[in-house]
Amino acid sequence: MSLELSKFSVINRQGQNLFTPVDFVIAKGVVACVMGPSGVGKSTLLNAIGGHLSSDFRIAGKLVLNAQEVTHMRVAERHIGILFQDPLLFPHLTVGDNLAFGLKAKVGDTKQRRLLVEQALDQAQLTDFYHRHPQTLSGGQQSRVALMRALLAQPQALLLDEPFSKLDLDLRHTMREFLFDQARLRLIPVLLATHEPADADAANGPLVILKPALSPAQ
């Protein structure tokens, strides 16, 4: 599995590039980082890759996932997961039911789905948390649940939009290592948007620096 961007940029309604077009490849199991000044378009880049781009923008360039061009595919067809700053768990559902949302509809019967969720909880060191509710969990525990939910969907690539920004330093380190280990174990290409050099150092992968453009698209 690999994720490849060629002359990739995002263009606004005025026909301007938000950032200088980028070219890079993320191999399977590799964590790449994208950095740049605040407001340059890191989150917009991730939304464009994941298929969540606002209608105020359009894509220029090519996006290839596992040798298949997905530039203009619908979200569901891309099989690209994304994690945000906030875990975005459903407060009215148990932890187990939150995780089950990540499973594809055709995956197993009720018993098999329950087993997959419990295995995910074990991997996240959250055994016996199935019937807990999100509001009873710490920030780090909620982040782990959100990650495992994304992984249960079996994404072919994973996008991370500053998922550690609200965690303290110790928890940030722990969660970062857990997330990177899970991605490498599953051989998923990962792109992390961050403003922290320590994240890029820990990722030890390609570093993409977004540069403001706001020039007419070619």
Regions found by a protein language model. Give the residues of each.
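A short, proline-enriched helix->beta-strand linker immediately N-terminal to the Walker B motif
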Residues: 152-156
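Hydrophobic anchor residue at the start of the ABC signature
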Residues: 147
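Short coil-to-helix segment of the ABC ATPase nucleotide-binding domain corresponding to the Q-loop/switch region
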Residues: 93-102
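Catalytic Walker B motif of ABC-type/P-loop ATPase nucleotide-binding domains
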Residues: 158-162
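ABC ATPase NBD coupling module
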Residues: 68-84, 105
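Conserved ABC ATPase "signature" region
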Residues: 111-129, 180-181
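Conserved ABC ATPase signature
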Residues: 133-137, 141
